């Protein structure tokens, strides 16, 4: 599963793990990605989205209908 949020577009960040002796090793900071299923009344079906924790909060605030409308407008496959 790709570590990209469908709503916010959050992608992994890159940086270093720094040990006690300050040796730096490359690492990846992944967003908190979850698969969530929502029922969308206008489509009359369930929609499964790959979301970050912030993306889930956006859906809670704006509503699934508004978010799905935006996703369809920008050509996202649902």
Swiss-Prot record:
Keywords: Ribonucleoprotein, Ribosomal protein
GO BP field: translation
GO cellular component, one term: ribonucleoprotein complex
The keyword Ribonucleoprotein is annotated on this UniProt entry: yes
Family per similarity comment: Belongs to the bacterial ribosomal protein bL28 family.
Gene: rpmB
The species this protein was found in: Leifsonia xyli subsp. xyli (strain CTCB07)
GO MF: structural constituent of ribosome
InterPro entries noted in UniProt: Ribosomal_bL28, Ribosomal_bL28/bL31-like_sf, Ribosomal_bL28_bact-type, Ribosomal_bL28_sf
One of the Pfam families matching this protein, by short name: Ribosomal_L28
Transmembrane segments: none
Protein name stated in the entry: Large ribosomal subunit protein bL28
Domain of life: Bacteria
């Amino acid at each position: 599963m790709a570590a990209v949020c469908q709503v916010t577009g959050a992608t992994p960040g890159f940086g270093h793990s720094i040990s006690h002796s300050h040796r730096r090793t490359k690492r990846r900071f992944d967003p908190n990605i979850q698969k969530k299923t929502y029922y969308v009344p206008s489509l009359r079906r369930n929609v499964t989205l790959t979301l970050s924790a912030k993306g889930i909060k956006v859906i809670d605030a704006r509503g699934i209908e508004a978010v799905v409308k935006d996703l369809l407008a920008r050509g996202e496959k649902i």
